[in-house]
Amino acid sequence: MNVKKTENALSVTLKNFIKSESFGGIFLFLNAVLAMVVANSFLKESYFALWHTPFGFQIGDFFIGFSLHNWIDDVLMALFFLMIGLEIKRELLFGELSSFKKASFPVIAALGGMIAPGLIYFFLNADTPSQHGFGIPMATDIAFALGVIMLLGKRVPTALKVFLITLAVADDLGAIVVIALFYTTNLKFAWLLGALGVVLILAVLNRLNIRSLIPYLLLGVLLWFCVHQSGIHATIAAVVLAFMIPVKIPKDSKNVELLELGKRYAETSSGVLLTKEQQEILHSIEEKASALQSPLERLEHFLAPISGYFIMPLFAFANAGVSVDSSINLEVDKVLLGVILGLCLGKPLGIFLITFISEKLKITARPKGISWWHILGAGLLAGIGFTMSMFISNLAFTSEHKDAMEVAKIAILLGSLISGIIGALYLFVLDKRAALKK
């Protein structure tokens, strides 16, 4: 299969995903820059105070709510992880992760891209209070990485874009596992049993192919609360909920009805404005077309713009702001070096070496249309950790270790920026060299 066939095989969903994520990456970057500017301006006290503002309602002596920062990190980010879970489920069932042959190469690449950065960080920070931050450089920000790769346009093979997307999805799955295993404290088993009960009810609804999203979302709120109270980060509940959303589509009767409506519309007279009959037909077509979509597709379609243009930019604005002044101890343990080297060196080396070895051992096969030089370029772009790395840094370091958290955020910004610039320049030069050889 050549590159052209690969491009033709790229689904409409994947193309739309690339477009939305690439623009989202640029918007994300602007919000991160704005956060740094505000955090180092005369507005910095107001900026930091804003995120600690309690938001909720009072019932007697009880306050139900969180600080604005917790609403973003625990509640809104749960919606982001719900979308991530839906993407992972879709890829596992129908996409690039749906078979061992398709999934093995990007999954192994993601594994190498997580292990190497984690080991680099842990080696530099072993036996220090900051060693728990090894998960920070293990993540990849798909929005930023795709934003960079889309700016390069046709200079990058479509097959490489597909590989990077699949790698990032597998990386997200790995990040979820890391959060569940290593950033969970003080487990409360009674709440875990409650969460398990909710999951069983969701599984029954899925088995019965209940297509309305309302019961899933209502139970999802209950699941989020149980998981939040159990000591596991609540975003894990969102991923579990995503895997319970049905993916089956209804019978073909809706297709016949759509065809009949289309014929009726074609038979109506055309004019400058739509007639009442035409409007009614189009409304019916819209309803029937929506009914043909699976609940998973409907929810993913709804969440994609909210996540890309509201949740993630807001998360970036709330978390990327670090006041860079003389009070920051950049030498706290080796957090700065561990994160930067993990992202800029560990990611590309881990991805390149593990895929190279696995192909030589005939465990996996490199996708057609991608050279080893391309794999190295994708590895460099995978070093853009940003939002996922920021999220893990919030889990790894508590307020008692605030210095390490602030240094980690500076390191994430620097490491992601370096990876993005070097990766883009590398792929640009690679394309120029290939053009000169032709």
Curated annotation (Swiss-Prot):
<keyword id="KW-0997">Cell inner membrane</keyword>
<feature type="transmembrane region" description="Helical">
    <location>
        <begin position="337"/>
        <end position="357"/>
    </location>
</feature>
<keyword id="KW-0050">Antiport</keyword>
<dbReference type="GO" id="GO:0006885">
    <property type="term" value="P:regulation of pH"/>
</dbReference>
<dbReference type="InterPro" id="IPR004670">
    <property type="entry name" value="NhaA"/>
</dbReference>
<keyword id="KW-0813">Transport</keyword>
<feature type="transmembrane region" description="Helical">
    <location>
        <begin position="23"/>
        <end position="43"/>
    </location>
</feature>
<feature type="transmembrane region" description="Helical">
    <location>
        <begin position="372"/>
        <end position="392"/>
    </location>
</feature>
<dbReference type="Pfam" id="PF06965">
    <property type="entry name" value="Na_H_antiport_1"/>
</dbReference>
<feature type="transmembrane region" description="Helical">
    <location>
        <begin position="302"/>
        <end position="322"/>
    </location>
</feature>
<feature type="transmembrane region" description="Helical">
    <location>
        <begin position="410"/>
        <end position="430"/>
    </location>
</feature>
<feature type="transmembrane region" description="Helical">
    <location>
        <begin position="133"/>
        <end position="153"/>
    </location>
</feature>
<feature type="transmembrane region" description="Helical">
    <location>
        <begin position="162"/>
        <end position="182"/>
    </location>
</feature>
<keyword id="KW-0406">Ion transport</keyword>
<feature type="transmembrane region" description="Helical">
    <location>
        <begin position="185"/>
        <end position="205"/>
    </location>
</feature>
<comment type="function">
    <text>Na(+)/H(+) antiporter that extrudes sodium in exchange for external protons.</text>
</comment>
<dbReference type="GO" id="GO:0005886">
    <property type="term" value="C:plasma membrane"/>
</dbReference>
<comment type="similarity">
    <text>Belongs to the NhaA Na(+)/H(+) (TC 2.A.33) antiporter family.</text>
</comment>
<dbReference type="InterPro" id="IPR023171">
    <property type="entry name" value="Na/H_antiporter_dom_sf"/>
</dbReference>
<keyword id="KW-0472">Membrane</keyword>
<keyword id="KW-0739">Sodium transport</keyword>
<feature type="transmembrane region" description="Helical">
    <location>
        <begin position="104"/>
        <end position="124"/>
    </location>
</feature>
<feature type="transmembrane region" description="Helical">
    <location>
        <begin position="62"/>
        <end position="82"/>
    </location>
</feature>
<protein>
    <recommendedName>
        <fullName>Na(+)/H(+) antiporter NhaA</fullName>
    </recommendedName>
</protein>
<keyword id="KW-0812">Transmembrane</keyword>
<keyword id="KW-1003">Cell membrane</keyword>
<keyword id="KW-1133">Transmembrane helix</keyword>
<keyword id="KW-0915">Sodium</keyword>
<dbReference type="GO" id="GO:0015385">
    <property type="term" value="F:sodium:proton antiporter activity"/>
</dbReference>
<feature type="transmembrane region" description="Helical">
    <location>
        <begin position="212"/>
        <end position="232"/>
    </location>
</feature>
